[in-house]
Swiss-Prot record:
The lineage of its organism: Bacteria, Pseudomonadati, Pseudomonadota, Alphaproteobacteria, Hyphomicrobiales. Belongs to the anhydro-N-acetylmuramic acid kinase family. The gene is anmK. This is Anhydro-N-acetylmuramic acid kinase. It comes from Sinorhizobium medicae (strain WSM419) (Ensifer medicae). InterPro entries: Anhydro_N_Ac-Mur_kinase (IPR005338), ATPase_NBD (IPR043129). Keywords: ATP-binding, Carbohydrate metabolism, Kinase, Nucleotide-binding, Transferase. The keyword Transmembrane does not apply. It catalyses: 1,6-anhydro-N-acetyl-beta-muramate + ATP + H2O = N-acetyl-D-muramate 6-phosphate + ADP + H(+).
Length: 382
């Protein structure tokens, strides 16, 4: 085992609901310790600005461009991440000097893998200056430069977790990690540590957009709205018949690849119920492209907290002879897993270890990635 490094991971996902922070100790291969984690919610006004940023980003041709509000938005987003790091350190009585590196995802505002273009807002140099900690950021670009889709990146961390769980006899291969965030993705861990990963379809994004447009709330907490509705089979099938699910070549998704239904298509409750079903069914339908039928689906991300999604997923998986377990049943943290992954990837980046593989993003060969922003020297801060 190499030198153990203390890392903080920061994740602001496609749901745009806030910043997840997690601490991890690792040598870039073995997970030595999963530390504390926390979430810092964005206020409604800032969430609205982020959504405006998505519109501004549509005109980007080169990834360095920041048209419209994006330059100011990137600056504020970075400062909010710095505040989250400082608050997390204070809350957990951790000295910044004891943290070796921060893994900074930033906020994705554009992802066009067919054009080798991905844009995450986030100023790594500013974050390093504000926190006094080295920062690894921009971890998707090198994958795209080598022919990859730029996503998903979390499979390297899933593989490390699977190794830990299988060593303890808690899972048996083949197993699949399911992350239900704004977009859902699958990581298949097969026999002999084979890794295959890809986006599986819409996660929470469509439900969030639907209830925000029709009820003025950011998400369907606890699936309460969906639980009052019925699945509209024709509407569900209009999503599940999308060419994405039948294409032999897997690709990464942007939140704009699937749009919510029109306002007249369903009642609030039926729309939420149908979209919850689509989320679950998309996972099982996409799993048909895996090398083998999974024994276990390990579910993390915000979608695992929606009982309606989980109920449908259980039912559909059982019909395939598989079981579904929430991350917590295996002593994992389903809320902080992506933030933990970004801490893990930051350490791998510093060590020059691969972040992505041909089986995860379609990259031509295993490649590392990320840019390193150094913390200010003592002379600069004196």
């Amino acid at each position: 085992m190499g030198k153990t490094v203390t890392a903080i991971g920061l994740m602001s996902g496609t749901s745009m609901d806030g910043i997840d922070v997690a601490l991890l100790r690792t040598d870039g291969e073995t997970i030595v310790d999963r530390g504390p984690s926390a979430g810092y919610t964005y206020d409604p006004a800032f969430r609205a600005r982020l959504k405006t940023g998505l519109d501004d980003a549509r005109s980007i041709v080169k990834r360095e461009e920041r048209p419209g509000t994006l330059a100011d938005l990137e600056h504020e987003l970075t400062l909010r991440h710095a505040d989250a790091v400082r608050g997390f350190l204070h809350q957990n009585n951790i000295l910044s000097e004891s943290v070796d590196v921060v893994g900074f995802h930033g906020q994705t505002v554009l992802h066009r893998p067919d054009e080798a273009l991905t844009v995450q807002l986030g100023d790594g140099d500013l974050l390093a200056q504000e926190t006094g900690i080295d920062v690894v950021y921009d971890m998707r670009a090198n994958d795209m430069a080598h022919g990859g889709q730029g996503a998903p990146l979390i499979p390297a961390y899933h593989a490390a977790l699977a190794h830990e769980l299988s060593k303890n006899g808690e899972i048996v291969a083949p197993a699949v990690f399911v992350n239900i965030g704004g977009i859902s993705n699958l990581t298949f861990i097969g026999w002999r540590d084979e890794i295959v990963a890809y986006d599986s379809g819409p996660g929470n994004t469509l439900i969030d957009q639907w209830v925000e447009a029709h009820a003025g709330i950011p998400f369907d907490q606890g699936g309460m709205i969906a639980s009052e509705g019925s699945v509209m089979r024709e509407l569900a099938e209009s999503y599940l018949s999308h060419p994405f699910f039948s294409a032999e070549k897997r690709r990464s998704l942007d939140r704009n690849d699937f749009a919510p239904p029109s306002g007249e298509a369903a009642s609030l409750e039926d729309g939420a119920r149908t979209l919850a079903h689509v989320t679950a069914a998309a996972i099982i339908r996409s799993a048909q492209h895996l090398p083998a039928r999974p024994e276990t689906y390990i579910v993390c991300g915000g979608g695992r907290l929606n009982p309606v999604i989980m109920r449908d997923l259980h039912m559909l998986a059982e019909a395939e002879g598989a079981r579904v377990v929430a991350a917590e049943a295996l002593r994992l943290n389903g809320d902080s897993m992506e933030a933990e992954a970004w801490a893990y990837l930051a350490v791998r980046s510093r060590c020059g270890l691969p972040l992505t593989y041909p089986g995860t993003t379609g990259v031509s060969r295993p490649v590392s990635g990320g840019r390193l922003a150094r913390k200010p020297s003592r002379a600069e801060t004196a």
